[in-house]
Every structure is written in C-alpha cells, then in structure tokens.
C-alpha cells in the first residue's frame, strides 16, 4: 500500500496514550501492545471524525526507516506503533478545521465553527483546572481584549510565514476564536532537557545532497546511526541557528527534532554544535534562498554582518548547486509508506529516495564496498576497488572497524602493504586483525619496532622467542631504542632481565638521550600545568642500573 497524504492524530489533555505521557518528538509503543490493539490511531484530513474525544490535533511524521515500524489500514483510518510529533493545534478553534480543509476535509456538511463547537464541549467543568482549559480561556480573553489576530496556515507552508486569514464571511461568530500566534507558542515547546542540557527550540542539520547525510540515506521522520557508527564519528552534527557560519559546506538545511525520550538516544554537547545518533527530520530548505536565512534569523542567526541575500549568494553561485536545484524545492516531498502485514516480521519500511543521479563520493564507495563484501557480492566490490585511493581507505576503515572478512578478501584479491596494515592494526589496538595479518609474509623487524614503541610486551616477547632464528645485539637495540622513544618502561625492564648480555654501554647511553629528549618535548609542548614525567625519570634510573651491570660484567 502506497500512501502520501498527511496524517493526523487526535490527543487529549494531558496528552497520554495507554496511561503513558506522549508529546513532541519520538513516541513509541511496544510491538506486544501494538498487536493487542493499543497502537496510535491516525486519520487523513478528509476522515477526521465529527465526534471524537480529544483536545488537540497533531500532524504526524512517520519514522518509516525504523526497522520496528509497523503501519496498517484500519476501519477508522490507520494504525501504527510509532509517531513523531511536532506541531499542535486546538480542536476547539475553527481555524484548525479551515487548515484541515486544505488537506481535504469537507466543510460542506458541517462548518468549521460547528465542528469546533462540537469539540469544545470537552472543556467541561471537571476540566476547569486542566492546562487545556486554562490555555483555552487565556487565549479567549486575549482575543476579546483585542490583543490577537487570526492567522491561517497553508499546507506545507513554513511555520515561520504569516498569511491572511480566510475565514468564511458567512461563518458563525461563536465568540471564542483562538489565534494561531499563540498556538505557535504552545507548539514551539522547547526540547525535553537531556542530561541537564537546555536545548534550543529549533535545531538544524546541513547536507550537500537532499536525501543523503554523509554516506547515509535520510528521509523525513526518524533517522538513526548505530552506536558503532556514532562512536566512529559518523553521527549527526546538529547546529543551533546562531552557530551556522557563513560558508558552511552544504546546499540544504533541515529543521530537526531530537527524540530525547528514545531509550537509545545519545547526545553530546560540543560547544558549537551537538553530536547525536538520531534526529527526526521535519522541513527542508535550500541554502541558496534568502528566505531560508530570514527564517534562521528568527531563531538566532546574526544577519547584521552578512545579510540573508549575501549568505544565499554564496550557494546560488556554487556550481554543484545548479545541478542540485533542478531536482529540489523548498519542502520535502511527501513520503511513500509501505504496508506492514499482520505478521510483523520486522520488515524495514523506508521512504522512497533515489540516489542514482548523485555522484559517488569516496566515503560512499568505501561504505558500499564493505556492504558488498559482507553480502558476498564480490564482483560489485571489485569494480569500486579499482581506485587506489578508495582501496587504501577500505583497508584503513576495515582495520579500524575490526572487519576481518573485508581484510581476508582484500589479501586474496589485491597486493597491499601488509606492513602498513600491521602498523595500523597495532596503533588501533585491533589484535584480531594483527594476528590474522601475521599469517602472511611481513617485515618482522619493522613489526617488532612498532610493538616496542607502542608497548605491546606480549607481542615483543613472542616475537623474540619464536620469530627470529638468532637474537643479536642489533635486534635487542631496536627494541630498547623504540621502547625509550615510546616511554615504555615495561619493555625496558624486559630487555634488562632477559637480554642484558646483548646490550652495550653505548646502546644504553643512546637510549638515555632519547628519554631526555622525550622529557624536554613533554615539558615544552604539554598543555597541562601538572606535567608528569615520573615514568621517564624511572627509566633514567633503570638505565643507570643497566650500565652498572654491563660495566661490571666485563670484569
């Protein structure tokens, strides 16, 4: 089932579902509850009921790319297990139904005022202490005092743009019109505080391509990175409007909501931006349009130094922009949703996005190669591996992500620098990869030097015992000098106890000089006020003891 209409949800006051609070952002119920008929009920505008218990109307964004997402037709509309909520409208306000008319609601049979009056009965005496009732009365009093004006909301129009009311001239005056200026105050609720962070009302992400963030396809609704990707610095960079620089790299800006109530949500405050693993994408704007920056100006972007026109001109004159504009508009197209059958087999349902016209970046190629190899689609991977730069990056990313299958395939198919790969595996502490690479022909002396400078005592010990036919002074000296350079006192102790007979006084003095240079470097370039060189001092003392042993052994 394909479906592109805007869907709506009706909520009560307080907003709850199955006795659990719901609100702005990501809301989810368990699949178990969903199967029991306790999911979220959604309506098309043309099927909004005349009588339904509720206070608020909520346009919803469906997180269709969530693997747990379930969506099906029901006798009353649609039924799902997760929704993302942002805007909020009062059902006691006729303007809400005028807005719904533009989405397909028929007001011929029952006028907007009559429908609003029908819903207003829920503001009964037993709710006089409720937030909804107080909010309703405050808006009614403000209107009667002449402090408010009506605003009409066009479908898909930016919430930042005001336009004239088109209330019918023959409509009844029921005496309590609630203005949408003040409803915006209610809907622009600040994000739920997360770990003590006070988040701005509006946050944004910037992308080069319309449906792609980095190498990841994105769409309207919930978009997630895995925790592994997040830890590899592949999460979303989320900006406050005031921190958007003049020459940021990108062509589209998306307003986002942070699903702070999601159990797997992660957020880091990095001073000038936020770093997170999931966002809910709402609206999309072109950075080549001055109106985009005027909207951002309302959320804190400074337009005094560079005007909206000057900022937009940077992107309008960009060559890639001319290509991208041919397939874009101000707002995201409606998402196409796929039906999830009653078996709920965790089928992934995603919005339809095509990237066939988007040139593949190096990162995209690398990501695709990893996926092809994991799926045993080796021919597809081989075509992309012909580029040397791509090949090198595939090796690097495979080692850093501990992807042994990719490394095995690359060793079988290509000639690459085993020694560099071993060095990177040790630097990244990927010992499984290191042990696999050791099975092939490699430079043992170079590997021993790397293990010594990085402090891998077990590897040094095994190599000295098994990988060399004969231990000599040159080999021991390589270990000693590299251990001194890396400040690895345990390796120096190892040499002093097992191979002291191969060490000369000159070798020790050279190692001492290396450690003294290390101390000088630490004291000169360290940013810490409390400089710790205790390990280096212990090494110098150990070298003095070693010199005494070497000198005395000659007599």
Swiss-Prot record:
Top-rank taxon of the source lineage equals: Viruses
Instruction: Please report the residue spans annotated as repeat (ANK).
Output: 364-389, 390-420, 422-447, 455-488
Q: Recite the UniProt keywords alphabetically.
A: ANK repeat, Repeat
Q: What is this protein called?
A: Putative ankyrin repeat protein L283
């Amino acid at each position: 089932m394909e479906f592109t209409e805007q869907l709506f949800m009706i909520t009560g006051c307080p907003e709850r579902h199955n006795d659990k609070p719901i609100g702005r952002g990501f809301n989810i119920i368990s699949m178990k509850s969903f199967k029991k008929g306790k999911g979220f009920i959604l309506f098309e505008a043309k099927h909004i009921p005349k009588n339904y218990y509720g206070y608020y109307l909520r346009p919803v964004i469906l997180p269709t790319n969530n693997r747990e997402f379930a969506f099906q037709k029901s006798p009353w509309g649609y039924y799902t297990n997760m929704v993302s909520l942002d805007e909020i409208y009062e059902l006691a306000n006729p303007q809400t139904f005028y807005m719904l008319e533009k989405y397909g609601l028929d007001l011929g049979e029952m006028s907007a005022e009559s429908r609003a009056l029908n819903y207003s009965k829920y503001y009964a005496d037993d709710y006089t202490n409720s937030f909804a009732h107080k909010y309703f009365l405050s808006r009614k009093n403000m209107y009667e005092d002449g402090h408010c004006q009506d605003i009409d909301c066009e479908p898909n129009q930016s919430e930042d743009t005001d336009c004239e009311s088109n209330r019918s001239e023959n409509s009844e005056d029921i005496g309590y019109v609630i203005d949408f200026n003040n409803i915006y105050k209610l809907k622009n609720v600040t994000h739920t505080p997360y770990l003590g962070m006070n988040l701005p009302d509006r946050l944004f992400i910037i992308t080069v391509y319309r449906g792609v963030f980095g190498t990841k396809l994105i769409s309207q609704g919930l978009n997630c990175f895995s925790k592994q990707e997040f830890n590899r610095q592949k999460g979303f960079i989320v900006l406050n409007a005031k921190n958007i620089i003049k020459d940021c790299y990108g062509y589209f800006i998306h307003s986002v909501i942070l699903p702070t109530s999601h159990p797997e949500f992660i957020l880091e405050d990095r001073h000038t931006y936020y770093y997170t693993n999931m966002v809910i994408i709402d609206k999309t704007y072109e950075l080549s349009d001055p109106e985009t920056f005027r909207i951002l100006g309302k959320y804190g972007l400074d337009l005094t130094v560079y005007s909206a026109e000057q900022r937009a001109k940077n992107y309008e004159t960009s060559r890639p922009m001319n290509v991208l504009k041919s397939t874009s508009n101000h707002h995201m197209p409606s998402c196409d949703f796929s039906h999830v059958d009653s078996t709920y087999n965790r089928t992934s349902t995603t919005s339809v996005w095509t990237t066939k016209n988007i040139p593949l970046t190096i990162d995209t190629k690398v990501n695709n190669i990893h996926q092809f190899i994991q799926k045993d689609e080796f021919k597809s991977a081989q075509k992309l591996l012909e580029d040397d730069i791509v090949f090198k990056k595939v090796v690097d990313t495979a080692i850093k992500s501990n992807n042994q299958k990719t490394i095995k395939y690359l060793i079988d198919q290509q000639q690459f620098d085993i020694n560099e790969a071993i060095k990177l595996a040790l630097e990244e502490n990927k010992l499984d990869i290191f042990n696999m690479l050791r099975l092939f022909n490699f430079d043992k002396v170079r590997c021993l030097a790397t293990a010594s400078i990085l402090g891998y005592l077990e590897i040094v010990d095994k190599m000295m015992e098994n990988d060399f036919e004969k231990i000599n002074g040159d080999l021991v000296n390589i270990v000693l000098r590299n251990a001194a350079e890396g400040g690895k006192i345990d390796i120096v102790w190892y040499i002093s106890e097992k191979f002291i007979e191969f060490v000369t006084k000159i070798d020790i003095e050279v190692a001492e000089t290396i450690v003294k240079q290390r101390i000088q470097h630490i004291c000169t370039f360290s940013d810490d006020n409390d400089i710790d060189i205790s390990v280096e001092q212990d090494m110098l003392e150990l070298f003095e003891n070693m010199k005494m042993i070497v000198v005395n052994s000659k007599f």
